[in-house]
Amino acid sequence: MNEEQKKALTAVLTQLDKQFGKGTVMRLGEQVAAHDIQAISTGSLTLDIALGIGGLPKGRIVEIYGPESSGKTTMMLHVIAEAQKNGGTAAFIDAEHALDPIYARKLGVNTDDLYVTQPDTGEQALEICDALVRSGAFDVIVVDSVAALTPKAEIEGEMGDSHVGLQARLMSQALRKLTGNIKRANTLVVFINQIRMKIGVMFGSPETTTGGNALKFYASVRMDIRRIGSIKEGDEVLGNETRVKVVKNKVAPPFKQAEFDILYGQGVSREGEIIQLAVNADIMQKSGAWYSYRDEKIGQGKEKVRLYLKEHPDVAQEIETKIREKFIGGELHLPDAAGDEIDTSINDEE
């Protein structure tokens, strides 16, 4: 590339950044993320690294989708807990009317300070969301879920009435209004979404998300969460092995993936992630079944080391800080995902 082309490239990238926001166009080989963007941790160290900026970006729209019982709500409760730990305020728009406060408390959410609403219609839910955003008082707002945002006309109509594209139009209109307010208020708004199957698809994935196409465009980050296995102790199932693919990312290079454990009643196994990443980054050494840190043996077998880190949170925090330094903006990187498993073609029938 000659000098004139370099100048032209710099000029057009600067113009696009001004017009559409920083990080609109990035070189895929460039591992530098938009570090001036504030982030809220997801509660999963591996996912924070995969996202490139240490968490989910404030002032942006984020979508997380996946099959039933894959960990979508669990992950968002972790995000709320992390925001509250840092003195932030959170709201949960429970369109599914299924929030479990006891489970939320187990994940570290301060339910006394959590603002919850259970709207009757999709219009009401999105109006409440817009009002909360415009107040500027909230750090994170979670909408659970897009599929449950039922238009008023559908609720008031008869069973079996056709309402083609009604929810898609509602989402499109709401997101046009929301996106500017979210940026100005520097609020993270997360939409949890479900997966549907398209009938008669011969080639490609038959899966698509609900609510039309608007959210796919307006979201700065889209995450596909899947359960890939079970964690067992004998015959007893203790939790799920989970994989999250970052299928869209406007604040850091996309297509990264994170794998971690979600334990029943506890949420993300933070200690398990620390062990895995610390060994990969050569912060912790593994010799046979023994693990050592700073030339001192800390346990035999992963479970013993996990218990050691739980009993010594200061050591766990020290190792986590070193991992973040090495991976986020450092010389180490997580592997890319194999590809987007969901069809992103226009589908406004939901």
Curated annotation (Swiss-Prot):
Keywords assigned: ATP-binding, Cytoplasm, DNA damage, DNA recombination, DNA repair, DNA-binding, Nucleotide-binding, SOS response
GO annotation (BP), single: DNA recombination
Source taxon at top rank: Bacteria
Pfam families to which the protein is assigned, alphabetical: RecA (PF00154), RecA_C (PF21096)
Location relative to the cell: Cytoplasm
A GO molecular-function annotation: ATP hydrolysis activity
PROSITE patterns linked: RECA_1, RECA_2, RECA_3
Positions that bind ATP: G66, P67, E68, S69, S70, G71, K72, T73
SMART domains: AAA
This protein's record includes keyword Cytoplasm: yes
Any one of the GO CC terms: cytosol
Main location: cytoplasm
SUPFAM superfamilies linked to this entry: P-loop containing nucleoside triphosphate hydrolases (SSF52540), RecA protein, C-terminal domain (SSF54752)
Family: Belongs to the RecA family.
Function: Can catalyze the hydrolysis of ATP in the presence of single-stranded DNA, the ATP-dependent uptake of single-stranded DNA by duplex DNA, and the ATP-dependent hybridization of homologous single-stranded DNAs. It interacts with LexA causing its activation and leading to its autocatalytic cleavage.
Cross-referenced HAMAP family: RecA
Record protein name field: Protein RecA
Organism from which the protein derives: Dichelobacter nodosus (strain VCS1703A)
Phylogenetic placement of the source organism: Bacteria, Pseudomonadati, Pseudomonadota, Gammaproteobacteria, Cardiobacteriales
Primary gene name: recA
